[in-house]
Amino acid sequence: MKLKTILAAALLAVGLSVNAQTIIKFSHVVAADTPKGKASVFFAQKAAELTKGKVKVEVYANSALYKDKEEMEALQIGSVQMLAPSLAKFGPLGVKEFEAFDLPFIFDDTADLHKVTQGPVGASLMAKLEPRGIKGLAYWDNGFKSFSANTPLKAVADYK
């Protein structure tokens, strides 16, 4: 059900013509065999299936079209219609609150993360993108950050 809602929102965002096929360019910067890469291909397949071919999602993995720092501008000018960026990429657009997701120790686990992203806070953050010409469709899990050091990292102060 959630996938159908996301797909419907994507179709509205790009404007579906009655007879013409709509092409959605979906750019991301990770390899095709990663969870995000596989999910983007799955999305493309479901879009074609659920729209009976009226929507074709072209997936461009591994920075094939744009590098990480170029993707957001490409989205804003319409060169691509979908991205799956790191949430921190929305900070330079003036929505600095998204940068909080990159802080260590902010969530205890994935369930804790989902309480925020799938609740009122997540919806409020998504709404802040719309005045910038971006319609957020969903939060994708991208795994927690991993750090390594020569000494144990147990508190924020240990990262200095």
Language model segments and positions:
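Short, polar/charged alpha-helical segment
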Residues: 33-58, 120
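N-terminal secretory signal peptides that target proteins for export/translocation
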Residues: 1-2
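Contiguous mixed-secondary-structure segments that line small-molecule binding/active-site clefts
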Residues: 44-45, 76, 81, 86-160
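Sec/Tat signal peptide C-region and signal peptidase I cleavage site
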Residues: 14-20
